[in-house]
Amino acid sequence: VFAAVSWTSTSATPLQAQQVELATPEDGEPPSPPERSVPSRRPVKEKIPIHHLGATDSPPLPGQPWKIHDRYRPRPKVVQPGETPDAPPSDATILFDGQGLDAWCHHGEEDLWYVPMWLVEDDQLVVEPHTGSLYTIDSFGSCQLHLEWMIPEGTKGNSQGRGNSGIKFMELFEVQILDSFSNRTYADGQAGAIYGQYPPLVNAVKPQGQWQVYDIFFEAPRFEQEELVRPAYLTVVLNGVLVQNHRQLAGPTGARAPVYRPGTPAAPIMLQDHGNRIRFRNIWIRELPEDTSHR
């Protein structure tokens, strides 16, 4: 039989010893040792095998200065994604978040800029018809653009006269905005079209009163000594549906014959005033490197 001694005291009496009987272990069974706390260990830093960091003797990649799994190839920078698919990532530039039009202007004669006359209502950017198109104050070349737009319910008209607007990259290359839900028009002029050049692969437009979502990837044309060495390309996703798959542009879009002319590597993005009260929200942009093939 094992016993333990404990001490009790009160404010009026000194400490007194009390004998406490403990349970008697079964015959032939040794008593359990007292439990001891084990001090926690610091986590051991994981050692990564050197071959997991890349190779130095692997075959070269055709057309690139790197080898397969090249140990010395630069690793991508870290970008924090948005909390939702439509939220801007950490490296995005906010063009409109419902708070104001500081990123935009109208263009006047002789390249003069003036204050936007479009409206901000309910955290939305609203076209004020016949006040002129809006332009970003900053210039952009190759980029990823996220933009949400809506044709207000009850918008009247037909064909190109119903819910018409557009997004022009470098003021030259237009992705069409139009109410294309049960509204017939020419194929390369409906929503999702690269205006005048490519119809969308499918018509993915929602009815009036619902928000439409564009995610557009634009590769700017490149010139060397005024010679075109790479044309422009556009990839367009409308409402989660791929409608333009890395299309090579024949030149600036529009009704005229497309012809490339040397210009600056970057220019403003334009939102078109076509006389219809289109609504926009949540516009952000990411600048993309001009050439990613060797990264």
Q: What do the predicted segments below correspond to?
A:
Residues 4-22:
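Signal peptide processing junction and immediate N-terminal pro/mature segment
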Residues 20-295:
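Carbohydrate-interacting regions of secretory-pathway proteins
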